[in-house]
């Protein structure tokens, strides 16, 4: 929810925030904002090369998407300021990755997912328990789910055709099959029923489908 995200940002922006010697406060401030504002998977974010980010036109080139799907991901200037600031303060001559490990090379997912779940979420007052008893509960991948739901809601609020919104969002997220987006968004609300029913047809008509 918006309230939970505000608490998460409050935690990572706090001067009292402390992580291990490999991961600075600025790293988490920038990474979590990137994931929340773009819907990137954690692995995609950590795979980003400095050269994959166009700081002038505010576009990210994702070359390591799931299923070898490449795509362009635009971002707002407000996020761009964080990315530029991080790059200026953290990048060193010879670095390849945008989030280069202090020891060189790509950072590992595990420590980051653990810190988010065991450190940041509890400090934000967010329960680690699953809401339905079946899923794994909130984790860093939940930021992608939150982005997707917010994006669809915003498109509908702006008066855009909801029948076309889902397939375009599917492409933005790097899905090759709209059913992945349907499951991912958990469209169980009554107002989205028609979107699911016509989603396959729209995906084939507008984007040509694929799996």
Question: Across the structure, where does each feature detected by a protein language model lie?
Answer:
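Conserved catalytic core of the tyrosine transesterase superfamily
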Residues: 1-211
């Amino acid at each position: 929810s918006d309230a939970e995200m505000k608490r998460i940002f409050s935690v990572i922006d706090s001067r009292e925030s402390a992580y291990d010697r490999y991961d600075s406060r600025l790293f988490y401030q920038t990474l979590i904002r990137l994931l929340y504002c773009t819907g990137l998977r954690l692995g995609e974010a950590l795979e980003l090369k400095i050269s994959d980010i166009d700081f002038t036109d505010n576009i990210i080139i994702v070359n390591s998407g799931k299923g070898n799907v490449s795509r362009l991901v635009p971002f707002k200037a407000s996020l761009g300021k964080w990315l530029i600031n991080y790059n200026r303060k953290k990048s060193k001559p010879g670095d390849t990755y945008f989030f280069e490990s202090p020891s060189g090379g790509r950072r590992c997912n595990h420590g980051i997912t653990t810190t988010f779940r065991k450190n940041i979420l509890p400090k934000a007052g967010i329960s680690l328990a699953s809401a339905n008893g079946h899923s794994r509960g909130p984790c860093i991948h939940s930021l992608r789910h939150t982005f997707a739901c917010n994006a669809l809601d915003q498109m509908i609020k702006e008066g855009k055709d909801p029948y076309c919104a889902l397939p375009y969002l599917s492409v933005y997220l790097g899905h090759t099959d709209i059913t992945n987006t349907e499951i991912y968004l958990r469209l169980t609300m009554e107002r989205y029923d028609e979107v699911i029913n016509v989603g396959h047809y729209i995906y084939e008509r507008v984007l040509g489908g694929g799996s």
